[in-house]
């Protein structure tokens, strides 16, 4: 890409189903099957303006990756989707995050129900201090009344979906703390999908794992997109290229470019994106 390409007509900067509205000043085109639509989103930590006029559409049934240097706002953006910031009164979001026609930022929305619809897995594995079985059953009991047989089936289903069942089926009564780091992360994924969310958020799920465990998580992500809309934050650009269908590049709280992952990595529309991907920046 030559220097002239960084000064293209803004209307031609979209590289996929949604362009970089923050970079062009225009509302990106929404994909026909958008699961989540972010409209003019701004986020503040007290007076610090962390996200600036983000416009973005998350395609349904796909894996979308957020990439960018540390502090660019990618994890902050991810956590607005299920209102993780609601625990902290000094943090606030303005704008719209729309899913199924409903603005998720509305204060009257039940937080527990929202987080049942939009599950989340964090950077560090966080098993509950209880048995493997109860780690899975705990969240389910909050939203459904199942018989013991039905719960057994749900636990097996979730652990199977997370590619963990065969490794733990004979020790379900044992503590989740006894599992390896990679197994604990898959347990957390199983716990997240056990309540059957529509969207699964993954905040750097492999950063604390060894290469073998990372490979298994990446394989799992590829399988999960057949049932869920997946959004992943990663510092690992190779991981984004391997796992995602769409990629958003962020810098200093702004969305610089968004599009199909292959196009973002092979022929980005913005020079800033190219500089980051090729290692000349960040």
Curated annotation (Swiss-Prot):
Amino-acid positions noted as binding ATP in the UniProt annotation, renumbered to this chain: 68-75
CDD domains attached to this UniProt entry: ABC_PstB_phosphate_transporter
EC numbers on record: 7.3.2.1
Start and end residues of each stretch annotated as Disordered: 1-24
GO cellular component: plasma membrane
Protein's membrane topology: Peripheral membrane protein
Primary location recorded for the protein, binned into one broad class: membrane
Pfam families: ABC_tran
Residue span, ABC transporter domain: 36-277
GO biological process: phosphate ion transmembrane transport
GO molecular function: ATP binding; ATP hydrolysis activity; ATPase-coupled phosphate ion transmembrane transporter activity
Biased composition (Basic and acidic residues): 1-10
InterPro entries: AAA+_ATPase, ABC_transporter-like_ATP-bd, ABC_transporter-like_CS, P-loop_NTPase, PstB-like
Low complexity bias (residue ranges): 14-24
Glycosyltransferase in keyword set: no
Record field: catalytic activity: phosphate(out) + ATP + H2O = ADP + 2 phosphate(in) + H(+)
Subunit and partners: The complex is composed of two ATP-binding proteins (PstB), two transmembrane proteins (PstC and PstA) and a solute-binding protein (PstS).
Its job: Part of the ABC transporter complex PstSACB involved in phosphate import. Responsible for energy coupling to the transport system.
Record-given protein name: Phosphate import ATP-binding protein PstB
Source species: Burkholderia thailandensis (strain ATCC 700388 / DSM 13276 / CCUG 48851 / CIP 106301 / E264)
């Amino acid at each position: 890409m030559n220097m002239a390409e960084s000064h293209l007509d803004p209307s031609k900067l979209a590289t996929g189903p949604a362009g970089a509205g923050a970079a062009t000043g225009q509302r990106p085109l929404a994909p026909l099957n958008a699961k989540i639509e972010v409209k003019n989103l701004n986020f503040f930590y007290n007076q610090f303006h962390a996200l600036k006029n983000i416009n973005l559409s998350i395609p349904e049934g796909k894996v979308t990756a957020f990439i960018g240097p540390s502090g660019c706002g990618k994890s902050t953006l991810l956590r607005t989707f299920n209102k993780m910031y609601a625990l902290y009164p000094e943090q606030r979001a303005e704008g719209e995050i729309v899913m199924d026609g409903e603005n998720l930022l509305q204060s009257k929305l039940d937080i527990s129900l929202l987080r049942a619809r939009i599950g989340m897995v964090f950077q560090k594995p966080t098993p509950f201090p209880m048995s493997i079985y109860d780690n899975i059953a705990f969240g389910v009991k909050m939203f459904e009344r199942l018989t013991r047989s039905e719960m057994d089936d749900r636990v097996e289903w979730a652990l199977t979906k997370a590619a963990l069942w065969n490794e733990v089926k004979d020790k379900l009564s044992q503590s989740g703390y006894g599992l390896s780091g990679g197994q604990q992360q898959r347990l957390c994924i199983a716990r997240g999908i056990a309540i059957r969310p529509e969207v699964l958020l993954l905040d750097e799920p492999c950063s604390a794992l060894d290469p073998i465990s990372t490979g298994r998580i990446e394989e799992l992500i590829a399988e999960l997109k057949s049932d869920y809309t997946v959004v992943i934050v990663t510092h690992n650009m190779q991981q984004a290229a391997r796992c995602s269908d769409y990629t958003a590049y962020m810098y200093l709280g702004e969305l610089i470019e968004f599009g199909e992952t292959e196009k973002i990595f092979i022929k980005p529309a913005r020079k800033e994106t190219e500089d980051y991907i090729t290692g000349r920046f960040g």
